[in-house]
Amino acid sequence: MASSNLIKQLQERGLIAQVTDEGALAERLAQGPIALYCGFDPTADSLHLGHLVPLLCLKRFQLAGHKPVALVGGATGLIGDPSFKATERKLNTADTVGEWVEKIRRQVSPFLDFDCGKNSAIAANNYDWFGGMNVLDFLRDIGKHFSVNQMINKEAVKQRLNRDDVGISFTEFSYNLLQGYDFASLNKQHDVELQIGGSDQWGNITSGIDLTRRMNQKQVYGLTVPLITKSDGTKFGKTEGGAIWLDASKTSPYKFYQFWINTADADVYRFLKFFTFMSLEDIDALEEEDKNSGKAPRAQYVLAEEVTRMVHGEAGLEAARRITQSLFSGALQDMTQDDFAQLAQDGMPIIELENGADLQQALVSAELVPSRGQARTMISSNAVTINGEKQADPEYTFSASDRLFDRYTLLRRGKKHYCLICWKA
């Protein structure tokens, strides 16, 4: 992605929601590499899909020759950003936030290149400059540059200020000052000239631009990426089981892969522009091919493979493919013990059974049928499989040969209703 027309290319991919002084920023980028940053507050022990677009935007800038700074908010994570939040955030302990900072730092690192010469990435933590700052210095050196009149008129906090039942604490109200100072501090330390973030961060970004101009007498810029929405109006990055996390121990590579496989046709080509590094020409060609093939579109599989490989690596992608193929075909011999553990992690219904349990009991316990009588009917009609093999004997009792890795049995009713049996030792 060439630096000279980077803004235009980002716009063509739909990746810019707002930008300050677009002409001046484009001109500055054309003059040569800049340093830019994006902040990630540790509000949980993992980043989620909502963080992926700004994180990949950092990578896009680095690929164009610019120097990215990934800022983890060890200090701001202790306060909580009120932007467009209906209620006050729960304050987490310093120890908890400290643990989350390290996890998120490790999560961000694989996306950027920290050893590529002049534009090598930098990892920073804003606790480094806020941790030793006393309240008098904060108020005198930072607070004096902020107008309360302007702060209360920012859209990000207006809704809270106008609600008598919730309001906003001074703690969260001060967040804007902290993030603003991040920009000024990074500008002074690393000559950072651009902040990027989600569109909900616009108010915080413009505060940082104003503060940097006042404190450092430097012109800097801001750019936001859009809030990702789905064509049906539902929230992106959420499932019935909750958020889709980037941490494999919270959302397995298989579930992550399936999330992308299930992307609607109306969204998939747009998501390829947001979440992959495929060229626009290749995405357009894929869309044209899908329209003319008369078959199920390939785009979902391309999207799932590209993003899963990027987040979970080749091994994670291979595991996701293996589980998907095994469940689809019913041939489980290729699945590993870790693959079964992924299914258990992903929320597949699980029951524990004692030795000697029969098939009818298992179907009822798994709530795949309401009664033993219904279980008999389902079994007799060849609607039940054990580890991918049909079982038509209503009186069937499980044996040791049904246990995969001496631990698991996969039960299925019909085509889509699964349960994983975990046998008690």
Swiss-Prot record:
Motif placement: 'KMSKS' region: 235-239
Substrates-to-products reaction catalysed: tRNA(Tyr) + L-tyrosine + ATP = L-tyrosyl-tRNA(Tyr) + AMP + diphosphate + H(+)
Localization of this protein: Cytoplasm
GO MF entry, a single one: tyrosine-tRNA ligase activity
EC main group: ligase
Ranges spanned by the short sequence motif 'HIGH' region, renumbered to the chain: 42-51
Family: Belongs to the class-I aminoacyl-tRNA synthetase family. TyrS type 1 subfamily.
Cited PANTHER family: TYROSINE--TRNA LIGASE, MITOCHONDRIAL (PTHR11766:SF0), TYROSYL-TRNA SYNTHETASE (PTHR11766)
Protein name in UniProt: Tyrosine--tRNA ligase
Organism: Pectobacterium carotovorum subsp. carotovorum (strain PC1)
